[in-house]
């Protein structure tokens, strides 16, 4: 079985046949599964630059301004402690309102944010949390 086949099997075990289930019901099923399975707290970081960062990371934004803004805004380069996950949270830092919210605390200064769970990954690639978050992110971005 390939890595992708194994991932598809894990996802199907959580949501069932997602073609027969509404997107919201699948998100609920993932929330229930992750609530029971994630080992919190755990260290996480961004999968890729957060929405607000694109202007600075791949656009014409000033590096000096980017560093200034990073002091008060979450960055994909930061390491956070994922302390909880929640449903129906809307945060300016989340790219998709349908996403589950990860309540995170930045390790460098203790600032707390809500980030989209599909936008973060566990730092420890060998942990069960890495696989759980990756499975959710893959399902979410492919089905939203």
What does each model-identified segment do?
Residues 49-52:
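Short, catalytically relevant binding-site loops at active-site mouths
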Residues 1-47, 62-135, 143:
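Basic/aromatic-rich interaction segments and small domains that mediate binding to polyanionic partners
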């Amino acid at each position: 079985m390939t890595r992708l086949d194994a991932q598809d099997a894990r996802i199907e075990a959580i949501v069932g046949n997602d073609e027969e289930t509404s997107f919201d019901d699948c998100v609920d099923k993932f929330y229930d599964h992750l609530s029971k399975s994630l080992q919190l707290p755990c260290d996480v970081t961004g999968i890729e630059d957060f929405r607000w960062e694109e202007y600075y990371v791949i656009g014409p934004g000033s590096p000096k301004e980017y560093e200034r803004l990073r002091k008060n805004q979450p960055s994909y380069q930061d390491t956070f402690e994922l302390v909880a996950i929640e449903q129906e949270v809307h945060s300016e830092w989340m790219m998709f309102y349908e996403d589950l919210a990860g309540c995170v605390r930045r390790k460098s200064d203790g600032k707390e944010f809500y980030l989209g769970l599909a936008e973060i990954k566990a730092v420890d690639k060998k942990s069960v949390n890495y696989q759980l978050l990756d499975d959710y992110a893959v399902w979410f971005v492919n089905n939203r």
